[in-house]
């Protein structure tokens, strides 16, 4: 990307303030980020679930370290001019760890960073067996994250996973507490039905706090299109696993055919070709740079 981190943060804020609804797919590397950008999406989410799957080949159960996550975030941010939301998990420890995580993610180029109130080791928000920390402890983590910002335009988002454990009322209670602590966006994970998704929007209407929803195919929450979420009052939506599930099926189907046929003929029509990919990935620019910086090689060593 050519835009500075500061410019991307301002763009993210402008989207919030102007009611420009953000559709943020879960991105896990530089390539998926570039593809999202040329597809006309206006926001990206670094997905811990997808990064655990692609980097480790393991489930989203808290196996990745801050360093690995920061490295992935940096690769994503550098590849695109679109604002990126960083998945800060639990902050990888207490409020002091949250401070370090916030700073690392901000330096990596994140426009917004969210921190969740799960007990570590965390797990995907739609899996069974989650546990949450007391709201008071997470309030201090959110305060720490907000205070730690180097660029005050970085947006801190608070995520709560309490719905599955203590119900919707507790999710709303925690949402208000986290907003009071400085979180500008709330992300209430794994709501069960459309009514809960609507109720949440009503609860925070006129409070000045923005809301993000999360859509995971086959997860706990029903799939609701962006237009309807926007109408309810949401500021944006994560499609956390769509890219991962799509890539996994595409490759599995194609590799099965390759193993069977010994050739790519069966899936050739589903592929981008050599020249199209080289154009997309930016080879033309590098050809120009080669010309510009080519040395006259006639001189003797």
Stretches with model-predicted labels:
Residues 3-5, 12, 244-301:
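Extended, intrinsically disordered, low-complexity segments
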Residues 3-235, 239, 246-256, 293-296:
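Alpha/beta enzyme core
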């Amino acid at each position: 990307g050519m835009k500075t981190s500061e410019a991307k943060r301002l763009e993210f804020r402008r989207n919030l303030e102007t009611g420009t609804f953000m559709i943020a797919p879960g991105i896990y590397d530089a390539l998926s980020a570039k593809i999202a950008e040329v597809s006309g999406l206006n926001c990206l989410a670094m997905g811990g679930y997808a990064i655990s799957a692609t980097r480790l080949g393991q489930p989203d159960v808290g196996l990745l370290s801050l360093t690995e996550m920061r490295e992935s975030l940096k690769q994503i941010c550098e590849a695109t001019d679109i604002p990126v939301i960083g998945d800060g998990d639990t902050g990888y420890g207490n409020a002091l760890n949250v401070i370090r995580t916030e700073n690392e993610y901000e330096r990596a180029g994140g426009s917004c960073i969210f921190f969740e109130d799960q007990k570590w080791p965390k797990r995907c928000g739609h899996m069974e067996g989650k546990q949450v920390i007391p709201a008071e402890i997470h309030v201090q983590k959110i305060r720490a994250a907000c205070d730690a910002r180097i660029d005050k335009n970085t947006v801190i988002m608070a995520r709560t996973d309490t719905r599955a454990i203590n119900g919707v009322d507790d999710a709303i209670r925690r949402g208000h507490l986290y907003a009071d602590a400085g979180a500008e966006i709330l992300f209430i994970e794994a709501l069960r039905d459309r009514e809960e998704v609507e109720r949440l929007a009503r609860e925070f209407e006129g409070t000045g706090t923005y809301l993000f929803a999360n859509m995971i195919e086959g997860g706990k929450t029903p799939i609701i299109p962006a237009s309807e979420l926007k109408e309810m009052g949401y500021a944006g939506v994560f499609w956390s696993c769509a890219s991962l599930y799509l890539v996994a099926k595409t490759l599995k189907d194609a590799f099965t055919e390759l193993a069977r046929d010994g050739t790519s003929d069966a899936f050739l029509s589903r592929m981008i070709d050599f020249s199209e990919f080289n154009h997309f990935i930016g080879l033309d620019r590098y050809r120009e740079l080669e010309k510009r910086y080519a040395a006259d090689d006639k001189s003797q060593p």
